[in-house]
Amino acid sequence: MKETVISIVGPTAVGKSLLGIEMAKRFNGEVISGDSTQVYKGMDIGTAKVTKEEMDGIMHHMIDIISPDESFSVADFQLHAKKCIDDVLGRGKLPILVGGSGLYIQAVLYNYNFSEQRRDESFTKKLEEIIEEEGPNQLYTRLKEVDPVQAAKVHPNNHRRLIRALEVYETTGMTMTEYQQQQQLESPYHLILIGLDMDRDVLYDRINQRVDHMIDTGLIEEVRDLIDRGYENCQSMHAIGYKEIIQHISGNQPMEYAIDALKQHSRKYAKRQLTWFRNKMNVQWYKMEPSIIDEKIEFILNDLAGILEEKSN
């Protein structure tokens, strides 16, 4: 019989972390972060990591495991997160994967086999040299020619994803979408997928308020510290919440412009997250309402209790 794994997904600022903690309390679980940026040490405010106080004694995994200058691919994330799931299950507890990084969560929950793809190190090195010497535009143009769907999802400055997409095409002859579809096999787990949504205007207000809170609690100081430690040009610093503040600190944008850009990018990201999870995964959706958040959480937990009881019978 497959072991049960729960995943809570949805857009940023919708309330996933709080539900995950309450769920872990109710069902003897532990939380595994499904956020691709929370793995980085020192990147706390901009990635909206839960604090020790907010964790309220619940064990959290996949947070603060590498430095901002270290490379951490989807395959790396999958390997580490699956080990966490095995560890939690091995101690008789319920793994609860919580986050909004769609591809990363999908890679963990399904049998993506990254090891089967042969990597041509010389080809990879050649692409890296082209970017270093000429910038990313030549490679981005090539990606638009061979895989326009993936090109629309990848920013030219995201060199790692740009190279990865071209690697897949070069070594398999498939687009990234085709490759991912081939890789998505049956899940090794009994999955319970819970999605949180919210009225768009309410969600966007929450996102704007979260950004203001990040600024008030020291995001600019956090980014300055990361720059002072030599991380400014690392891939991790291209994440939403960091690239915008870097533009301000470097003198390219006034503070209010940087904050507005951060809010706008976060809202657009939330929209992309919802699209991903609605199209890619068979999720049971629940609409959250901030004014009655406790009641909504209790409703979801009661629903889940029924599902788990039914499985055990």
UniProtKB/Swiss-Prot annotation:
InterPro entries: Dimethylallyltransferase, IPT, P-loop_NTPase. Monomer. It catalyses: adenosine(37) in tRNA + dimethylallyl diphosphate = N(6)-dimethylallyladenosine(37) in tRNA + diphosphate. One of its GO terms (biological process) is tRNA modification. Its cofactor is Mg(2+). Its EC number is 2.5.1.75. It comes from the Bacteria. Keywords: ATP-binding, Magnesium, Nucleotide-binding, Transferase, tRNA processing. Catalyzes the transfer of a dimethylallyl group onto the adenine at position 37 in tRNAs that read codons beginning with uridine, leading to the formation of N6-(dimethylallyl)adenosine (i(6)A). The gene is miaA. Residues 35-38 are annotated as: Interaction with substrate tRNA. ATP binds at G10, P11, T12, A13, V14, G15, K16, S17. It comes from Oceanobacillus iheyensis (strain DSM 14371 / CIP 107618 / JCM 11309 / KCTC 3954 / HTE831). The record marks S101 as: Interaction with substrate tRNA. GO terms for molecular function: ATP binding; tRNA dimethylallyltransferase activity. This is tRNA dimethylallyltransferase. Belongs to the IPP transferase family. Substrate binds at T12, A13, V14, G15, K16, S17. The keyword RNA-binding does not apply.
